[in-house]
Amino acid sequence: MSKDHKDKKRKHSDEATEEVEKKTKVSKKEKKDKKEKKEKKDKKEKKDKSEKKDKSEKKEKKEKKESEDVPTKSSAVVSTGYSQSPALTKLPQSEIDSFLQENEVTVEDPHNLGLRPLLGFDQIDLDSRIASVISKFPTPTPIQAVSWPYLLSGKDVIGVAETGSGKTFAFGVPAINNILTHDKKGLKVLCISPTRELALQIYDNLVDLTANTPLKCVAVYGGVSKHEQVSSLRNASVVVATPGRLIDLLNDGALSLDSIEYLVLDEADRMLEKGFEQDIKSVMQQTNHANRQTLMFTATWPKEVRELASTFMNSPVKVSIGDRNELSANKRITQIVEVIEPYDKEKKLLSLLRKYQSGSNKDDKVLIFALYKKEATRIENLLVRNSFKVSAVHGDLSQQQRTSALGAFKAGKTTLLLATDVAARGLDIPNVKVVINLTFPLTVEDYVHRIGRTGRAGQTGIAHTLFTEHEKHLSGALMNVLRGANQPVPDELLKFGGHTKKKAHSAYGAFFKDVDMTKTAKKIKFD
């Protein structure tokens, strides 16, 4: 073989080897690239998975925190099975419309259930033990007629109505019926009330309602032994409580609200006025909101009450009885306003008592309102000296004395009850014929609540008010209430010629300004 041929062959061999090495290098590089690419992909997927997990955990934490921050809103409660009776369904719509119009009923129903009001007790199917108690009444009151179908359907309800409208049975009947028909054990109903007197009154009504049942009702409030109340809570199905004592018992571990299914706030506006908002929220947080049906009753509908309702109620049905846009008095009450000199009030009071408690009316119940405790004590002594049998309810008396005084008045042992505004809201004292305002209250709202102690449960009543120049800044607002109830405005009151405007100052707070309504308003022209 020639040398040239050998060199040529070696060259081809070297080229082939080089080509193989080159291909091997490319193959290795491709494998390396693929490996790096795969590692990058795995790393990215791992990172995405980690980020997704973190987001999920953050979302869960956020949802958990939100759930803990707002534990007060009640969840939708399973319906107790209310169905409209055939008798109610057959009623012509004109009859329903007439009832709603006559009683000035407004219903705001976010569920659009369109449930008809109950015009008779025969239109509702209740446990026989409850039906036997309420059958002694002629018909349901407007607040009962409208709210019962919604409450029996498991809905949260807000009732805006005047005091004395039958609110205790409005929530009591559906609540007790629910316990009886489902044979529920343990503490199921909690009603929170602003004052001891109102709590005891609600308790008495619920005891009457459950008289034929094995259910136990308990009232807890301040001013008496806590130890005795703790003992009485054993095996209770229904508890009526004032906010302060309720918080005490919860803090002591003497009471658990885990099993509460029916929570009632009575006189919600009054409780906010008395500064119980934080106590109420604290109570809400200790209930099982998933199983809770919440009811709120209030005489007025201010911003603070609306905010409270939006916090812990679940799409509530709002039932309003009467014109709630303006402060209004019960039209069944004859209002008499007499303008006198301040020094004539005591003499005038004695004259009025002889007038309203004479002849066949000598045993009529008369409720007298004083403004301050010292005034109440002085007037009580005046009446005793003039041979009047009188009971008194004011802040200087012990709880036992106040309870005894109310009991004597309710039973007719005394026909005069002297009170400060502690008794002006919510107290249901049957058959009060006359309310006398010896001293006008600090606000016209309190005036309306005071006179609402008479004319209850469909009856008529008289409210006689002694008005002096010291209260002239309230004359305009008082005249509005009188006109709204179709009551005469005395000429002496018109002479004050004022309309009250409420003002507010960041440092001073709320105050009132007298405006002379006899002057022509200044006309402002815009170019």
From Swiss-Prot:
InterPro entries tied to this protein: DEAD/DEAH_box_helicase_dom, Helicase_ATP-bd, Helicase_C-like, P-loop_NTPase, RNA-helicase_DEAD-box_CS
Going by the entry's taxonomy, the superkingdom of the source organism is recorded as: Eukaryota
Give the motif span (DEAD box): 266-269
Q: Report the subcellular localization.
A: Nucleus, Nucleolus
- UniProt lists compositionally biased (Basic residues) regions at 1-11, 25-44
Top-tier EC class = hydrolase
What does the entry list as the binding residues for ATP? 161-168
Instruction: Using the record's annotation, list all stretches that form the Helicase ATP-binding domain.
Output: 148-319
Q: Which residues cross the membrane?
A: none
Alphabetized, the UniProt keywords read:
ATP-binding, Helicase, Hydrolase, Nucleotide-binding, Nucleus, Ribosome biogenesis, RNA-binding, rRNA processing
Q: Where is the composition biased (Polar residues)?
A: 72-89
Motif Q motif located where?
Answer: 119-145
Q: CDD domains, alphabetically?
A: DEADc, SF2_C_DEAD
Q: Which GO terms describe its molecular function?
A: ATP binding; ATP hydrolysis activity; RNA binding; RNA helicase activity
GO BP, sorted A to Z? endonucleolytic cleavage in ITS1 upstream of 5.8S rRNA from tricistronic rRNA transcript (SSU-rRNA, 5.8S rRNA, LSU-rRNA)
Q: Which Pfam families match?
A: DEAD, Helicase_C
* EC number, UniProt record: 3.6.4.13
Functionally, this protein is described as follows:
ATP-dependent RNA helicase required for 60S ribosomal subunit synthesis. Involved in efficient pre-rRNA processing, predominantly at site A3, which is necessary for the normal formation of 25S and 5.8S rRNAs.
- Reproduce the free-text note on domains from the UniProt record: The Q motif is unique to and characteristic of the DEAD box family of RNA helicases and controls ATP binding and hydrolysis.
Q: Which family does it belong to?
A: Belongs to the DEAD box helicase family. DDX5/DBP2 subfamily.
Q: What is this protein called?
A: ATP-dependent RNA helicase DBP3
Protein source organism: Debaryomyces hansenii (strain ATCC 36239 / CBS 767 / BCRC 21394 / JCM 1990 / NBRC 0083 / IGC 2968) (Yeast)
Lineage of producing organism: Eukaryota, Fungi, Dikarya, Ascomycota, Saccharomycotina
Q: Which gene encodes it?
A: DBP3
